[in-house]
Amino acid sequence: MPQSLKILQSLWTMQNLRSGPDATLRQNIGRIADAGFDGIGALWIDRAAARETAAIARGHNLIVEGLALPDSIDALKPALEWGAEFGLHHLNVQPNLRPRDIRTAIATLEGWQQLAAEVDFAVNIETHRGRLTNDLLVTLDLIDAVPDLRLTADLSHYVVGREIELPVSAETDVYMRRVLDHAEAYHGRVASAEQVQLPLDFPHARPWIEQFKTWWRYGFDRWRRRSGPDAELTFLCELGPQPYAIAGPDGRDLTDRWAESLQLREVARECWR
C-alpha cells in the first residue's frame, strides 16, 4: 500500500457540542465512523476506559491514538501496557513535568524512548503548553540533545504561547520547520497570536489558516521523504470545548465544532495532495 494520511477525530471535541447534550461513548464513536474518519483520539489514562474505547473503535474499524500524561519515566508504563493489550495505532504523550534543568528533561525523554522500544506501536511526544515541551526554544534544545525524538506537532500551542504574529519572521519559520522535521503525527487546530483556537469560518482566521496550511504542507512533505513506502501519517482534528472554544454571551459555542472538524479534515486532505 502507498503512504497514506489517516484523519482522526478527537473524542474531546465531542464534548458539549452545540448540537445537543453529550452522547454516549458508543454513540460518539459511531458518529465519527459514519462520517468517514479513519480513527479517534482518546484519553489513555484509565485501563477500563481504554479497554472499552478500543473495543468500540475496533468494531467500527477505527484506529486509536491514545493520550497519556506521565509525570515520570515509570508513569508511562501503564499506558504502554494497555496499548499492547488492547491495541493502539500510536501513543501520544503530553509530558506532565516541567523541570528547570534540561538534563532532567533529556533523561526523561531517553527513558521513555527505552520503554517505547519494547512495544510494537509508535510513541510520540506532543508539543503542548504547560508541559515539558511548553517552549519552542526549549523543544529545539531537546531535539538537539535527542536527535531521534518523535513529535506530535500541535503548532497552535507555540503560535499562541509565543505570540507569533503575521507575517511570521524568517527566524521563527526556521524554528517551526525544525519541529516539523521531527513530526510523526499532527494535531489539527488553527491559532493566532492571542487565541489558541480560531473559529474557522470567521474572516479574520483566513490568514492564519493559510499560514498553518503552509506549515502542514511542509511537514507532510518532509514526512513523506523520510518515511517508508507504506507508512501512515495521522492528523487528529482536535477542536476543544470551552475554554478552548470561544463562547457567546449565552454561554454557548460561537461555532459548530463538529462541522468545523469536517472542514478541518478537508484542509488536511488538501495539504496532503
Language-model features: locations:
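Hydrophobic faces of well-ordered beta-strands that scaffold small-molecule active sites
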Residues: 3-15, 40-42, 62-68, 91-93, ...
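Generic structural signal for well-ordered alpha-helices
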Residues: 25-30, 50-54, 76-80, 106-113, ...
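Active-site acidic/histidine proton-transfer and metal-coordination neighborhood
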Residues: 60-151, 160
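Acidic/histidine-rich catalytic cores of soluble enzymes
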Residues: 118-203
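A short, acidic, amphipathic alpha-helical segment used as a generic capping/interface helix at domain edges
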Residues: 174, 208-232
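Short, low-complexity, polybasic intrinsically disordered segments
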Residues: 246-273
